[in-house]
């Protein structure tokens, strides 16, 4: 589970096409990987991914074709950076709202409207 609060922002992303989908490597700070373990969950742009391996300033993930079809992870690069979040730990303040990061489908935005003159209560 995640809180939806971005903890890290990375513009250094390497992608390698694989038969199963994509190998993703994201540069992070040492602070972000402190206490991280192989198999931990990290949200990348809100998508729950499993840590394949990591170094103090680099995390590696495998992303399968289905996840690439339903998310924007295939579009990540230095021009489309990633928002990152570590999974919640029992007893930590949530500070946002509970988010699973498990993607079931995608939607198409049909229109937007300017809400500048609207009040919400």
Identify the residue ranges that each predicted region occupies.
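Conserved loop->alpha-helix
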Residues: 1-113
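Single conserved hydrophobic/aromatic residue that forms the stacking wall/gate
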Residues: 111-121
């Amino acid at each position: 589970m995640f809180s939806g609060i971005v903890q890290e922002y990375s513009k250094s992303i390497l992608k390698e096409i694989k038969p199963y989908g994509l190998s993703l490597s994201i540069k992070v700070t040492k602070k972000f990987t402190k206490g991280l373990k192989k198999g931990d969950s990290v949200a990348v742009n809100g998508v729950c991914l499993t840590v394949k391996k990591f170094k103090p300033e680099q995390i590696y993930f495998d992303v399968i074709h289905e996840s690439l079809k339903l998310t924007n992870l295939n579009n990540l690069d230095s021009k489309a950076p990633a928002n990152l979040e570590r999974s919640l730990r029992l007893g930590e303040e949530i500070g946002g709202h509970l988010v699973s990061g498990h993607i079931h489908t995608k939607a198409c935005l049909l229109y937007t409207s300017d809400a500048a003159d609207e009040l919400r209560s």
